[in-house]
């Protein structure tokens, strides 16, 4: 029996080589008899022209569209653009730096009960590197992101790295295009879906995350994400533990002490976190201090 779902796999790409990922997805789709599918890769104004050239191999693959944009429009806009380009009933967002680890990855989504309009499969962390801050953070957070934990608060655990939605749902609840900088566009999506009682399935269908940026780059991303959180703190209320902690610290007037210490230690802490022996506890303290300093 042909699959009931037609699937558009949507991959936003920025300075990332994703040819092998796309080939793996195409292979799985081809193995599902009768599946109508397409893979759309949208390069969002990448600055690494060598990687862009390598990704042009995608132009030779059947069922694959490779779209390049001259200017970067941001994480929310590029995903909305991909949804508009899609032609199938269901869309699957996959980040370009993820890897496939399950032979039935696509099939698991195709066979999912269609009463769910959104499904998130999670991700696993690989490539152990204890000198890498992003690895340390992701590995420490992994127990909180198991399927069992995600099911306790399904709307709080949505990440665009591995997210399937009915296309009409994605069009009805698009990503907020005010989010131009890094972070939290998927968190706000989860909140909107909760507000409208959209059915979400939290399933065990992970991709592998094993490509980590340098400590310097991750610190820049962290600060950018905290700026986003500060800007949209009203919209994200109730969906960020850092916002909740900040609220209580200000209520108790303790934020002045944290801010004073942060201002004295900021440069030294950042040097440590960008070095070869980053400390995860120090990272969490830095995040709190940096966030408080934004007000």
Regions found by a protein language model. Name each.
Residues 43-52, 98-99:
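A conserved acidic beta->alpha catalytic loop
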Residues 15-30:
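Short, well-formed alpha-helical segments that are part of the catalytic scaffolds
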